[in-house]
Amino acid sequence: MGIRIYKSYTPGTRNRSSSDFVEITKSKPEKSLLRKKLSCAGRNNRGLITVRHKGGGHKQRYRLVDFKRNKLDIPAIVASVEYDPNRNARIALLHYQDGEKRYILHPKKLAVGDKIYSGINVPIEIGNAMPLYNVPLGTAVHNVELIPGRGGQIVRSAGTSAQVVAKDGQVVTIKMPSNEVRMIYKNCYATIGEVGNADIKNIRLGKAGRKRWLGIRPSVRGVVMNPCDHPHGGGEGRSPIGRAKPVTPWGKPALGVKTRRQNKYSDFCIIRSRN
């Protein structure tokens, strides 16, 4: 992936950059793998806002992505690399030998025409999925399962990868992108390689409207609100928050407070915390 830098033709392009989409080989998605995606704009079934700063945005259709990789020992050919509006990574369309078509996350350096596999005894090559106990130490993996058969749940974002660092009995130890070190059952599947589109983090939107295209509404600071709207609000002119520590709009402690539940069921899996 490359980044296209815009010249200052207008105020909206002055600080703008975007992907050059050179890795995209097909513009229209596979119709059999599309589903409707309804926008709730952060509201629940009663119409109340449960997630702030959501609303608007371009209409999208969901692409069914195969996170389980459960078609074992059936070769698949990479037919195309496509854009997915629902995630920051690209997706690759696979044509299996038995005629089925599926999307997967597009790993870095996986090209159209490559042949990939899923299974226990498959080659250690980019795009192949296998149990963690068969992955050599030091190998970069992504789309890692937490429970065997459930499908990949972690290390799925663009440019991310985890590293297999140890094997001991029924567990495999991996180092996460956050530098957290944790244990995972050895029968969990993972895909070899790093997720592509790593330069997405270097893109500058350039104007507020591009945020709105993504369905993200403005975030307003509490200190500029009225007292009826936020605990930080009120005062004459530019005034401090008037409290010892910052709080959320509902009065709970914010900024620096640990949000992970104490005695969580998975605490025993974490060898070194990311914090």
Swiss-Prot record:
SMART domains: Ribosomal_L2, Ribosomal_L2_C. Gene3D superfamilies: 2.30.30.30, Nucleic acid-binding proteins (2.40.50.140), Ribosomal protein L2, domain 3 (4.10.950.10). Keywords: Chloroplast, Plastid, Ribonucleoprotein, Ribosomal protein. It is found in: Plastid, Chloroplast. GO terms for biological process: mitochondrial translation. Signal peptide: none annotated. Transmembrane segments: none annotated. It holds the Pfam family Ribosomal_L2_C. PROSITE patterns: RIBOSOMAL_L2. Residues 225-252 are annotated as: Disordered. One of its GO terms (molecular function) is transferase activity. Belongs to the universal ribosomal protein uL2 family. Part of the 50S ribosomal subunit. This is Large ribosomal subunit protein uL2c. The lineage of its organism: Eukaryota, Cryptophyceae, Pyrenomonadales, Geminigeraceae, Guillardia. The gene is rpl2.
